C-alpha cells in the first residue's frame, strides 16, 4: 500500500464529484487493521482533506469480504448518512502515532448531519477506489 496512490484516488473522487473536501462530512476507511495499509490510508486522507475529517472502518464489524467489501461498505455508508449516525471502528483503542491526524470515531457512534460522504477501498495489487455519495433529497 502506498499513501501516494491512495491520495490520488481520493483526489480524483473529490474532483469528479464537484464538491470540496470541506463538504464531505465522513470517510468510510478501507481500514483492514494492517499496520502498513492503515497508516498509508490515514496519511493519504490527511494529505487530501487537510483537516481531521471524521473516519471509521466498517470491516471491524464483519471482517474483510474481499471482492464484496466495496459494495457492502458503500451501501452501509449511504445508510449511515441517511440516518445521520456513523458507526465507530470497533476495538480501536489506541491510534498509532504514525497515522494521519484525523477524527477517528471510536467507542460509540456519532451523530453527523452531512450531505456528502466518501467510501474508500484500496485493494490487492493497487486497485484503489474512492467514491463520494450525496444524500438524496
Predicted regions and their residues:
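Conserved "HGTGT" condensation-loop signature of ketosynthase/thiolase-family condensing enzymes
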Residues: 1-137
Amino acid at each position: 500500500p502506498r499513501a501516494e496512490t491512495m491520495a490520488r484516488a481520493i483526489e480524483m473522487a473529490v474532483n469528479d464529484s464537484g464538491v470540496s473536501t470541506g463538504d464531505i462530512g465522513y470517510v468510510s476507511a478501507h481500514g483492514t487493521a494492517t499496520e502498513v495499509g492503515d497508516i498509508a490510508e490515514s496519511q493519504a486522507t490527511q494529505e487530501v482533506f487537510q483537516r481531521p475529517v471524521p473516519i471509521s472502518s466498517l470491516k471491524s464489524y464483519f471482517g474483510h469480504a474481499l471482492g464484496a467489501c466495496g459494495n457492502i461498505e458503500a451501501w452501509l455508508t449511504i445508510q449511515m448518512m441517511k440516518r445521520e449516525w456513523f458507526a465507530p471502528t470497533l476495538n480501536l483503542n489506541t491510534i498509532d502515532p504514525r497515522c494521519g491526524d484525523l477524527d477517528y470515531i471510536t467507542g460509540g457512534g456519532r451523530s453527523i448531519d452531512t450531505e456528502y460522504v466518501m467510501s474508500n477501498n484500496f485493494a490487492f495489487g493497487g486497485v484503489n477506489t474512492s467514491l463520494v455519495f450525496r444524500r438524496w433529497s
